[in-house]
Amino acid sequence: MAKFIDEIKLTLIAGKGGDGIISFRREAHVDKGGPDGGDGGKGGNIYFVGDKGKNTLLSLYGNKQISAEDGINGGPKNLYGATGKSTYVKVPIGTMVFKNDKLVADIIEEKEYLVAQGGIGGRGNAKFKSNRNTAPRICENGTPGEKYLAHIVLKVMSDVGIIGKPSAGKSTLLSAISNAKAKIAEYEFTTLVPQLGLVKYHDHSFTVADLPGLIKGASEGKGLGIQFLRHIERCRVVVQIIDFGSEEKNPIEDFEIINKELEEYSKKLASKPKVVVANKSDLQGFKERVNIFKAKYPDVEIVEISAIERQNLEELKGKIWKILEEAKLLPADEEEETEENVEIKLEDDYKISNPYAGFFEITGPKIEQIYHKIPLVSYDNLIRFNTMLKKIGVWDDLLKYDIKPGDTVRILDYEFEWDGEF
């Protein structure tokens, strides 16, 4: 059996945009050839693609990172750099991608979802030609692609989730009402991964998941614990199956333990529509235990079945279908806020430090953005770099630090001597 992996962390690195270049036409018989430096190509994106044929994140297990190709640099003669090749990764339906605890993508369909945006290609000097500057020696580097540590979580998607204590009959019930061939045995924790099945009821159908058995303390991680409680969150209806046929079992205690675990894990989960199923009606003492339960919980409606003998299963399917139909009329659950991947945005801030006399260092997201965007390879680019720093207030702030001509200023790995002119 394939290993069930439903949570991993890895780094996503989209492609960097290609750099624009400085170039001028140099052709025989062409007098005063103008600028012809082309733009860099866009960096490749990373997409996750929903695949109903997958039910685990095993294919991503062991990967430290997923990357896309960088864009190609521009060329002379106004040649645009090629776009970097995007990367497409197939993942199970129900996969969620988080960045700094914010939801980036919720894969609920068989389609492509953008999870990391490629960088923008830098402009070549042909784009900077104007009436005032007919021979610009200005170009831009491509911007970095989006890079972050992704927290990837799989929550199995099904209409109905079957929950209960170990050996309550969950797998037997799934096999009896659906097309699933679940593993069944007379020992606890037979089900180690969620099992999915399709249930047909008259002209309708719905999906059911058999989830690993819950024990006291599951919400704190005991047994298979929190790892599988999260899968129930995706279900629209919860079927709680209880063993009413065994003398050593306590149906009331089992009912209360499961409800407490759901409540402690998530109030939203505990409030989902629920069908309580009394299993093993074929065994002696069943009816007596049902009556004791009803005396304690007269308002809890239960469906009496025997999963192994396939007794009263049509009534159960009808009850589930009715609740599913009623659930459609309820307000939709609030979705987690999704972070838009339109463009990498940086804050407009910077910091000036003066660790010792005659030395100043400028750091911050906005400074890095400008520095990486403008390659300091020509006088015109230096002028543009200087102008942008002046525009955001860096030079005025340096004067407040009483900077003097001859002092050293460092911006990342670029150092220059302050001459008092800007």
UniProtKB/Swiss-Prot annotation:
Recorded GO cellular component terms are: cytoplasm
**InterPro entries of this UniProt entry?**
G_OBG (IPR031167), GTP-bd (IPR006073), GTP-bd_Obg/CgtA (IPR014100), GTP-bd_prot_GTP1/OBG_C_sf (IPR036346), GTP1-OBG_CS (IPR006074), GTP1_OBG_dom (IPR006169), GTP1_OBG_dom_sf (IPR036726), OBG_GTPase (IPR045086)
Q: Where is the OBG-type G domain?
A: 158-325
Sites where the protein binds Mg(2+): 171, 191
Location of the OCT domain: 334-420
Per its record, what are the GO molecular function terms?
Answer: GTP binding; GTPase activity; magnesium ion binding
- Supply the EC number(s): 3.6.5.-
Location comes to: Cytoplasm
GO BP terms: namely: ribosome biogenesis
**Positions of GTP binding:** 164-171, 189-193, 210-213, 279-282, 306-308
Domain Obg span(s) in chain numbering: 2-157
Q: What is the superkingdom listed in this entry's lineage?
A: Bacteria
Which of UniProt's keywords are assigned here? Cytoplasm, GTP-binding, Hydrolase, Magnesium, Metal-binding, Nucleotide-binding
Q: What class of enzyme is it?
A: hydrolase
Record flagged with keyword GTP-binding: yes
Main location as per UniProt: cytoplasm
Instruction: Name what cofactor the protein needs.
Output: Mg(2+)
SUBUNIT field = Monomer.
Q: State the protein's purpose.
A: An essential GTPase which binds GTP, GDP and possibly (p)ppGpp with moderate affinity, with high nucleotide exchange rates and a fairly low GTP hydrolysis rate. Plays a role in control of the cell cycle, stress response, ribosome biogenesis and in those bacteria that undergo differentiation, in morphogenesis control.
- Tell me which family the UniProt entry assigns to this protein: Belongs to the TRAFAC class OBG-HflX-like GTPase superfamily. OBG GTPase family.
- PANTHER family in UniProt: DEVELOPMENTALLY REGULATED GTP-BINDING PROTEIN-RELATED, MITOCHONDRIAL RIBOSOME-ASSOCIATED GTPASE 2
Protein name in the entry: GTPase Obg
Its source organism is Mycoplasmopsis agalactiae (strain NCTC 10123 / CIP 59.7 / PG2)
The encoding gene is obg
